[in-house]
């Protein structure tokens, strides 16, 4: 997300992923696909079906999805119910990457890149340096962190 200094609103521009991979000196072979740029609070099940369809039909068996934090657990559940035999990691940022050094987005993306390579097939949330199974995590709105339900 970007910040419009005139209206004071956040808006979506282009994905930052290619520049983030370059900045992180990532040597992995990555195919970036932008499916949509929508606030996760406005995401519908039709949007989630587009994500599921794309994952299901991807040649890759290891997939990272960047997603707004408010409904990423809901999307993870949606994808898990599809029972694809792929490792799918969903990550995001509590503070948008465009906000600079205060953002956790760069760290979370790096964590997702590492975890997706070693986790067994399934759907996971990766935030704050940890991975969580899709059905054992929640966003704690009081602390601003994701936490295990166990």
Indicate where each model-derived feature is located.
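Active-site histidine-anchored catalytic micro-motif
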Residues: 1-150
